[in-house]
Amino acid sequence: AQNAYAPYSGFKVGAAILCRDGSVYTGCNIENASYGASNCAERTAVFKAVSEGKKEFLKIAIMSSGGGFTFPCGICRQVLWEFMPQGDVVLGDVNGRIKVFKLKELLPEAFSL
């Protein structure tokens, strides 16, 4: 979350995705004055990994500057499903608490073609 660009909301989010080969890619949220042009930390991490040729992920960890747990938005859940439908979503908070969910718990009826 340290590198997040969040001048409008002040809500900074960071994510790290673990690839099947053991490599890790990080991402942060990047806001834009036109909110629709903003990008979440989870998708930033996924897109960085995919752009480097990685397409199999085991888990993603997410943390924010907020007081509680930050769950991935619906768009991020669907993007994650594309690459890790059996994967884990690890949530951390500023107090050191951790929660772990299977992605299928957070997106029980994912869209697919």
Task: Describe each PLM feature range.
Residues A6-S9:
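Short loop/turn motifs at secondary-structure junctions and domain boundaries
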Residues L18, E31, C40, F57, ...:
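Short, electropositive, low-hydrophobicity segments enriched in small/polar residues
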Residues T26-I30, K104-L107:
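Short beta->alpha transition motifs characteristic of CBS
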Residues A1-N3, E52-L113:
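C-terminal binding/interaction regions
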Residues K12-C19:
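Short beta-strand scaffold segments in enzyme catalytic cores
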Residues C28-T44:
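Compact, glycine-rich, soluble single-domain proteins
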Residues A45-A49:
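Short, charged beta->alpha transition segments
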